[in-house]
Regions:
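ATP-binding glycine-rich phosphate-binding loop
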Residues: 2-41
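ATP-binding glycine-rich loop module of kinase domains
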Residues: 25-71
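Intrinsically disordered, low-complexity regulatory segments of kinases
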Residues: 128-138, 143-149
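Short, solvent-exposed loop/turn segments at secondary-structure junctions
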Residues: 44-45, 51-53, 87, 96-99, ...
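Catalytic-loop of the protein kinase fold
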Residues: 142-157, 162
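Nucleotide/phosphate-binding site architecture used for ATP/NTP-dependent chemistry
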Residues: 7, 13-15, 52-53, 59, ...
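Conserved hydrophobic "DFG−1" position in protein kinase catalytic cores
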Residues: 39-40, 48, 83, 92-95, ...
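Conserved structural core of kinase catalytic domains
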Residues: 73-135
């Protein structure tokens, strides 16, 4: 399922109405290839996904972390799952403050993707450059996620934030 901004917003409204909450559409927290994220009046975030595959991956990761009682990896806080709706492709999660790690729509559960060693080396070199001297902290967090069976490949500023970026 792919959808337009209007369709995502309509699904978010339907979700909010069913839950008895309001979404502040003026407070968009994020927008990307996976979907759009808005703030609710319950101080949670609602993410409307573009595709079923990203919804399923992200939901699976949040459920795994919840079942393990994990709310942070390394020094990074992770949102907790509040609710979800598979028909509407919506996930509601807690708001987090930096330092945080979020956006699991491109993560893999229990099995890493079948990338060649060259692709992985290029990916790591790009991330090392993006994060600079902070890369060891990011690498530690990714190691923790792997120990929980989550292979996270959307490491970029914005998804992994330290809180002192200027």
């Amino acid at each position: 399922m792919t959808s337009s901004f209007k369709e995502q917003k309509d699904r978010a409204i339907e979700y909010a109405d069913a839950r008895g909450i309001s979404i502040d559409f003026a407070r968009q927290l994020g927008y990307g290839n996976d979907g759009i994220v808005w703030v609710t009046d319950e101080f949670t975030a609602v993410k409307a996904f573009l595709r079923q595959s990203n919804y399923s991956r992200e939901l699976g990761c949040y459920q795994r972390l919840e079942n393990l009682g994990i709310g942070e990896v390394g020094t990074f806080e992770i949102p907790s799952l509040v609710d979800s709706d598979a028909k509407l492709l919506i996930i509601e999660m807690t708001l987090v403050t930096a330092p945080f790690l979020l956006d699991f729509g491109k993560a893999y559960l229990d099995q890493p993707p079948d990338y060649t060693p060259e692709v992985l080396a290029d990916w790591e070199a790009e991330r090392r450059e993006l994060f600079g001297n902070r890369w060891p902290q990011v690498l530690e967090a990714l190691g923790w996620l792997r120990s929980y069976g989550i292979y996270y490949y959307d490491a970029k500023p914005g998804n992994i934030t330290f809180g002192d970026e200027s």
